From Swiss-Prot:
Span list, region Disordered: 73-97
Lineage, highest ranks first: Eukaryota, Metazoa, Chordata, Craniata, Vertebrata
Chain ranges on the Extracellular side, renumbered to this chain: 374-424, 527-547, 617-715, 790-885
One GO process term, biological-process aspect: calcium activated galactosylceramide scrambling
Species: Mus musculus (Mouse)
Name assigned to this protein: Anoctamin-4
Its membrane topology: Multi-pass membrane protein
Function: Has calcium-dependent phospholipid scramblase activity; scrambles phosphatidylserine, phosphatidylcholine and galactosylceramide. Does not exhibit calcium-activated chloride channel (CaCC) activity.
GO molecular function: phospholipid scramblase activity; protein dimerization activity
Length: 955
């Protein structure tokens, strides 16, 4: 039995030929080993043990991979499980039902009229369009390339013409070789698994233990959905000369539908439509309006009358809907291999990254929830909250001019307790944890991406030399230089021209950032003016909570401004990017991505930065307030601190923005598609349901966003920034992000499967420029969290008081008993008679004690009015300031060291993956040698059989 032509399958004593049929020699060998009747006295277990012992002494060329042990499945085998080989009975049955299959193919709208040629691509145009000559030349050249074509008119509008394209096997093979499409490679060497007694015992004990464990609920049910099982195969670039090396069960399904569409699109991008070196490609025809749309077809309906568990999947779209896009599987893992097979590697990588990000949010959300619950459980023991709630004799100065009244410090008891929920002893730990978490997330994503790239054959994939954008060619067609790669002349942009355009673009970016700052300034003016208005409001609820009402309404107005400016920013970013005249589409995409991210990041976080680092920091003090344009007094923090304002800002913005994004992602396409169907029914003049072919159904769906996955990535990257940058002030941000992402995955899946036309299956090795942006956000989050803890929260002032000024000063303790008297020490005294005329409140405070007040308190570390330097900074202020600066420096250096250490310790490529890659390279070479040797041996046998002479070999 030769290793090069047979293999053992599933540990049984059957040997199958590499072509898939039963090998004759192996069958004869079985007959020799298994004599008839009573003569059988051979111990087969001893024979197998002997074979295994011999295998240990030779160089076994395959490791213990079950996937390598069986042939790969093609598209159809995923939907119709069973033997990959067909018997003569199966063939006759298929031939008898051939006419029925062809009729069914014609009716489902996925094939030509003959029911044999599958539609690989659709072009749409209107007969009334004047670009007739260009289309005719283009379509004539399409036929010259070997593609088959058919045209159909729309059922509801005869002006709309659908051009159906089909690529025959010869065309697919020729261009697959040019594009280096990797396909399953034929296995030539059988594998005998090594078995060690010790490992076998361990496996047996583990299997017994697993029987008592519940099934993993998040894993996809492979028993009821066997179609999800797809064997892994070694692949190699397709070659027509070595076509016999590849596993080809059916030429019609050897290239899956996504690959076929990608090959056809590749052909269309290189076909001329006019004479001239630049008059080439489908994209230019779509730009000038010659064609309205171009897209590959969905594989039929995503719904079925029968259950997928009992009748199986009707098509891959139905399979994806049931096991991925349906809300009933929200808690299960994503079938990423199926997503990649249907939508391509680029979209598959997006969902892989989104799933990885969502999974990594679980520990962050758990720790954040723990920090919040820790604040809840320690609320009754918090000395600061107790003192605030019991401070009925401490009267606070008004927080605004004229209309704001004096108030007891105890009136802010609720806000002090809420502040403790987010600003407690666990906050610093959580900030350090999140900084480390961001690094671990990125480092392990690199490892995860490497595994995915290996499984999806992206390790050695390199992007093709990109075509020059038509706009770039039109602008610089007069200046040319030789391309160092292709050796062909191409348009050239002078360095001075490029620099001048970049300067203008940078000026535009700076101007738009100034617009954001102006919007924030407007919000500040609104807060300053409104707090006085709410303080004089008739309703007691609003009057007594004027600051909270001001913050809440300001956040809502800020959200509306953010959404309006986003529309403006997109147009400005588009204008500035086109002004730069990028040479290729990838350069254009990277430039546009950076601008949009910068605009939206500043737009979304500018108000948050103001509240975190500026609100209440530069207000002055009673009697000497700082004012805007010498009129409006700057807003002060609440008596319980500014952190409550920051929490409200983050919570409201995060919830509103995620809700709006989810509506725009799913609700808006649903409404658009419903309106399109309604319009079609009205134009057709009937309310009855029309049975449209698949190409017309897909044409009525919404096209994918013009910027591809840009909006999907941008939404998640902004959320990542919101989750990490100010997480010290809002520990529940990871939990909100987790809940949103669980919904986001299914929303995006539902949108791709049901609401959008099928996008072209594109390849990509990683998430592109977004990874660098994520790294930048991770660095920024360390800095901002250090400042939030040191400046925005009261963590440092409490720490200084406990060690320096409290009852435990000098004892090295910092418990709750050491915080006695902290509230009184953090408040300064102001003499009411020192108020400015325009700041003096209408009330004299007699409602508190029956007599006019002489003094009130305010948050600051200043000397009393009767001291030698009235209202000057105290020594405690300078101690707190020094401690804040020291904390920022120590925190940043410590966290950055931890981040770099983690980055150094975690390799980008897992060791087992590195070994698998090296072994695969070796195995592919061995299989190529074995396959070539087998081919030569077959040719030699054929020559001998036919009696043809051949040259003698050297001895």
């Amino acid at each position: 039995m030769e290793a090069s032509s047979s293999g053992i399958t599933n540990g049984k004593n059957k040997v199958f030929h590499a072509e898939g049929g039963l090998d004759l020699q192996s069958h004869q060998l079985d007959m020799q080993i298994l004599p008839d009747g009573p003569k059988s006295d051979v111990d087969f277990s001893e024979i197998l043990n002997a074979i295994q012992e011999m295998a240990k002494d030779v160089n076994i060329l395959f490791d213990e991979l079950e996937a390598v042990n069986s042939p790969c499945k093609d598209d159809d085998s995923l939907l119709h499980p069973g033997n990959l080989t067909s018997t003569s009975e199966d063939t006759s049955r298929l031939e008898a039902g051939g006419e029925t299959v062809r009729e069914r193919n014609k009716s489902n709208g996925l094939y030509f009229r003959d029911g044999k040629c599958r539609i690989d691509y659709i072009l749409v145009y209107r007969k009334s369009n004047p670009q007739t000559e260009k289309r005719e030349v283009f379509e004539r050249n399409i036929r010259a390339e070997g593609l088959q074509m058919e045209k159909e008119s729309s059922l509801i509008n005869s002006d709309i013409i659908f051009v159906k394209l089909h690529a025959p096997w010869e065309v697919l093979g020729r261009y697959a070789e040019q594009m280096n499409v990797r396909m399953p490679f034929r296995r030539k060497i059988y594998y005998l698994p090594r078995r060690y007694k010790f490992m076998s015992r361990i496996d047996k004990q583990i299997s017994r233990f697993r029987r008592w464990l519940p099934k993993k609920p998040m894993r996809l049910d492979k028993e009821t959905l066997p179609d999800l099982e797809e064997n892994d195969c070694y692949t190699a670039p397709f070659s027509q000369q070595r076509i016999h090396h590849f596993i080809i069960h059916n030429k019609d399904t050897f290239f899956n539908n996504a690959t076929r569409s990608r090959i056809v699109h590749h052909i269309l991008q290189r076909i001329k439509y006019e004479e001239g070196k630049n008059k080439i490609g489908l994209n230019r025809l779509l730009t000038n309006g010659s064609y309205e749309a171009a897209f590959p077809l969905h594989e039929g309906s995503y719904r079925s009358k029968n259950s997928i568990k009992t009748h199986g999947a009707v098509n891959h779209r139905h399979l994806l809907y049931e096991c991925w896009a349906s809300w009933g599987v929200w808690y299960k893992y994503q079938p990423l291999d199926l997503v990649r097979r249907y939508f391509g590697e680029k979209i598959g990588l997006y969902f892989a990254w989104l799933g990885w990000y969502t999974g990594m949010l679980f520990p962050a959300a758990f720790i954040g929830l723990f920090v919040f619950l820790y604040g809840v459980t320690t609320l009754d023991h918090c000395q600061v909250s107790k003192e605030v709630c019991q401070a009925t004799d401490i009267i606070m100065c008004p927080v605004c001019d004229k209309y704001c009244p004096f108030m007891r410090l105890s009136d802010s008891c609720v806000y002090a307790k809420v502040t403790h929920l987010f600003d407690n002893g666990a906050t610093v730990f959580f900030a350090v944890f999140m900084a480390v978490w961001a690094t671990v997330f990125l480092e392990f994503w690199k490892r995860r991406r490497a595994v995915i790239a290996y499984d999806w054959d992206l390790i050695d994939w390199e992007e093709e030399e990109e075509e020059i954008r038509p706009q770039f060619e039109a602008k610089y067609s007069k200046k040319e230089r030789m391309n160092p790669i292709s050796g062909k002349p191409e348009p050239y942009q002078a360095f001075t021209d490029k620099c001048s355009r970049l300067i203008v673009s940078a000026s535009g970016i700076f101007f738009m950032i100034c617009v954001v700052i102006a919007a924030v300034f407007g919000i500040v003016i609104y807060r300053v003016v409104t707090v006085s208005t709410f303080a004089a409001f008739k309703w007691a609820l609003i009057r007594n909570n004027s600051q909270v009402a001001t913050t809440g309404t300001a956040v809502c107005i800020n959200f509306c401004i953010i959404m309006l400016l986003n529309v403006l920013y997109e147009k400005v970013a588009l204008l500035l990017t086109n002004l730069e005249q990028p040479r290729t589409e990838s350069e254009w995409e990277n430039s546009f991505t950076l601008k949009m991210f910068l605009f939206q990041f500043v737009n979304l976080n500018s108000s948050t930065f103001y509240i975190a680092f500026f609100l209440g920091r530069f207000t002055g003090h009673p009697g000497a307030y700082l004012r805007l344009i010498n009129r409006w007094r700057l807003e002060e923090c609440h008596p319980s601190g500014c952190l409550i304002d920051l929490c409200m800002q983050m919570g409201i913005i995060m919830v509103l923005k995620q809700t709006w994004n989810n509506f725009m992602e799913l609700g808006y396409p649903l409404i658009q598609n419903w309106w399109t169907r309604r319009k079609v029914r009205q134009e057709h003049g009937t309310e009855r349901k029309i049975n449209f072919p698949q190409w017309e159904k897909d044409y009525n769906l919404q096209p994918m966003n013009a910027y591809g996955l840009f909006d999907e990535y941008l939404e998640m990257i902004l959320q990542f920034g919101f989750t990490t940058i100010f997480v010290a002030a809002f520990p529940l941000a990871p939990l909100l992000a987790l809940l949103n992402n669980i919904i986001e995955i299914r929303l995006d899946a539902y949108k791709f499967v049901t609401q959008w036309r099928r996008p072209l299956a594109s390849r990509a090795k990683d998430i592109g420029i977004w990874y660098g942006i994520l790294e930048g956000i991770g660095i920024l989050s360390v800095i901002t969290n250090a400042f939030v803890i040191a400046i925005t929260s009261d963590f440092i002032p409490r720490l200084v008081y406990a060690y320096k000024y409290g009852p435990c000063a000098g004892q090295g303790e910092a418990g709750q008993k050491c915080m006695v008297g902290y509230v009184n020490a953090s408040l300064s005294v102001f003499r009411i008679s020192d108020f400015e005329n325009r700041s003096e409140p209408e009330s004299d405070g007699s409602e508190f004690s029956g007599t006019p007040l002489k003094y009130c308190r305010y948050r600051d570390y200043r000397d009393p009015p009767h001291s030698l330097a009235p209202y000057g900074y105290t020594l405690q202020f300078w101690h707190v300031l020094a401690a804040r600066l020291a904390f920022i420096i120590v925190f940043e250096h410590l966290v950055f060291c931890i981040k770099h250490l983690i980055s150094y310790l975690i390799p980008d490529l897992p060791k087992d993956l590195r070994d698998r890659m090296r072994r695969e390279k070796y195995l592919i070479q061995e299989m190529m040698y074995e396959a070539e040797l087998e081919r030569l041996q077959k040719e030699r046998k054929e020559r001998k059989k036919n009696g043809k002479a051949h040259h003698n070999e050297w001895p």
